Amino acid sequence: MFLDLHPYTILVSIFIILLVKQIVGRIGKSTIQEFVWLLYLKISPNQAIKDYNTKKVELHEINKQKRSISAQDEYAKWTKLNRQADKLTSEIQKLNEEIRQSKASIDKLANVLLMVLTTLPIWVARIFFRKTHLFYLRSGIFPRYIEWVLALPFFPSGAVGLTVWMFAANSVIHNVISLVSFAFEKRVEKPVRQKK
């Protein structure tokens, strides 16, 4: 076998991958995609994005000037600013269409990256390490039928394989993350029975 890893290496790496997968699931793919997009906006060499940001700042300044003067008292200046604002708005809309295509490709790239980091390693491990004994239980710790279930699908009684380890680790990680995140969730008000 070309991937001859120690069983404890497999245990720890699968645990870390499952932990990352649960954290990604808790945060949400859309939140991660939005973070990647904002990061891309900051570091991108794309000229359309730079123009978009510059024009947004210009539009903000023009609108600020428009609000500071009276349309009745300084009509010519207000009209000139209004034309500039309309022109900038149309340019911003054109740039926004270009940027939307970039956002779609960045979102797709983020999805692929998340899949490569969380889902693909699990499937690779299931294929290559499905017959690897990860650890052994001493005989008599559990009743015989529980040892048999823990040895599923390919192992002699008393051995624990990847399938059972992944199931157990995923359950524990999910429960711990749920307990930790519960403390930060919005409080739910006690329901009050309505009188008839």
UniProtKB/Swiss-Prot annotation:
Transmembrane segments: 11-30, 115-135, 160-176
Keyword Transmembrane among record annotations: yes
Keyword Transmembrane: yes
Main location: endoplasmic reticulum
Intervals, Cytoplasmic compartment: 31-114, 177-196
Gene Ontology CC annotations of this record: endoplasmic reticulum membrane; GET complex; Golgi membrane
Positions on the Lumenal side per record topology: 1-10, 136-159
Family: Belongs to the WRB/GET1 family.
Function per UniProt: Required for the post-translational delivery of tail-anchored (TA) proteins to the endoplasmic reticulum. Together with GET2, acts as a membrane receptor for soluble GET3, which recognizes and selectively binds the transmembrane domain of TA proteins in the cytosol. The GET complex cooperates with the HDEL receptor ERD2 to mediate the ATP-dependent retrieval of resident ER proteins that contain a C-terminal H-D-E-L retention signal from the Golgi to the ER.
Protein name as catalogued: Golgi to ER traffic protein 1
